[in-house]
């Protein structure tokens, strides 16, 4: 079993290319859960994210959910989340219609955007000795609300700077004679994803801490299940009492689904109150 776990972890890390991550973040969430019956439960929570090397808050979210435990090993869930996301400033090269001839850069200012998200889950848990294997399949729909930002266009590259006497605009170590600013409309759009997650946790005898690891990947349902994002999480849950739970984890995300583009290492801190 230990050899299998080690091999699984190595494969997951290799596939994620963690060395390519270019950001560090701090994620936090607070949640409450109420058991209505032995089978039904409701929950609510808020989450905050600070990224861009902890320089910017990039997410404020709030959600509610409903859970149904069909058997000891099978459960279902549904939820809604409102997201207020911050999109960092982005610089992209611009090309002519042939797709090859470089003409300059487009720089989009940072902006906030609202999203509405609905999710439906099917989860399974199978105990194997002191280990528990978990599987979750989630359909996730996200609606992006239309908004506006400002775009700056740099055009007409200067190839002979020494002999140039006009205005100079510099970006990405290249020089241009023209700079224009315009409103950039970010239209409303919808995204559909299938988010699959596999996990393993270990029950340490006479210990309040339960270590776990999960591997999750997101497939775009609108583009032939294209793999857009992978996420690896390694952490532990502390069962303080029957009602209070504390969670601490390291998260690595690679790629972008309907969240912001992010190749990011993050420290995740969570607290849940169950009653």
Stretches found by the model and what they are:
Residues 213, 227-275:
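Predominantly the C-terminal beta-signal and adjacent terminal strand-loop region
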Residues 24-26, 58-60, 114-118, 187-194, ...:
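Residues that define the transmembrane beta-barrel architecture of outer-membrane proteins
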Residues 30-34, 64-68, 120-124, 139, ...:
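Residues on the lipid-exposed face of transmembrane beta-strands in outer-membrane beta-barrel proteins
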Residues 18-20, 50-55, 107-113, 183-189, ...:
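Outer-membrane beta-barrel domain signature
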Residues 46-52, 80-86, 126-128, 139-145, ...:
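Transmembrane beta-strands of outer-membrane beta-barrel pores
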Residues 21-69, 73-86:
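Start-of-domain marker
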Residues 23, 55-60, 88-95, 146-153, ...:
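Outer-membrane beta-barrel translocator domains and adjoining extracellular loop/strand segments
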Residues 39-44, 73-78, 129-133, 206-211, ...:
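Repeated loop/turn-to-beta-strand initiation elements of outer-membrane beta-barrel proteins
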């Amino acid at each position: 079993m230990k050899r299998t776990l080690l091999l699984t972890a190595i494969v997951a890390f290799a596939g994620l290319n963690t060395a390519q991550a270019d950001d560090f973040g701090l994620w936090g969430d607070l949640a409450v859960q109420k058991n209505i019956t032995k089978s039904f439960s409701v929950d609510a929570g808020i989450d905050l994210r600070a990224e861009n090397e902890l320089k910017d808050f990039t997410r404020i979210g709030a959600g509610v959910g409903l859970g149904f435990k069909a058997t000891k090993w099978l459960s279902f869930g549904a939820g809604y989340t409102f997201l207020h996301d911050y999109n960092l400033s982005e610089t992209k090269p611009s090309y002519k219609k042939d797709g090859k001839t470089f003409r300059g850069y487009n720089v989009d200012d940072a902006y906030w955007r609202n999203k509405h998200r609905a999710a439906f889950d099917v989860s399974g848990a199978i105990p194997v000795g002191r280990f528990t294997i978990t599987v979750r399949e989630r359909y996730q729909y996200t609606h992006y609300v239309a908004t506006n930002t400002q775009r700056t266009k740099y055009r007409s590259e200067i190839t002979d700077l020494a002999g140039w006497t006009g205005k100079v605009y510099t970006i990405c170590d290249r020089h241009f004679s023209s700079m224009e600013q315009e409103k950039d409309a970010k239209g409303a759009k919808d995204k559909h994803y299938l988010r699959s997650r596999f996990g393993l946790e270990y029950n340490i005898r006479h210990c309040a801490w339960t270590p776990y690891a999960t591997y999750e990947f997101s497939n775009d349902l609108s583009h032939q299940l294209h793999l857009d994002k992978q996420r690896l999480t390694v952490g532990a849950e502390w069962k303080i009492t029957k009602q209070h739970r504390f969670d601490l984890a390291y998260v690595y995300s690679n790629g972008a689904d309907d969240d912001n583009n992010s190749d990011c290492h993050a420290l995740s801190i969570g607290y849940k109150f169950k009653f």
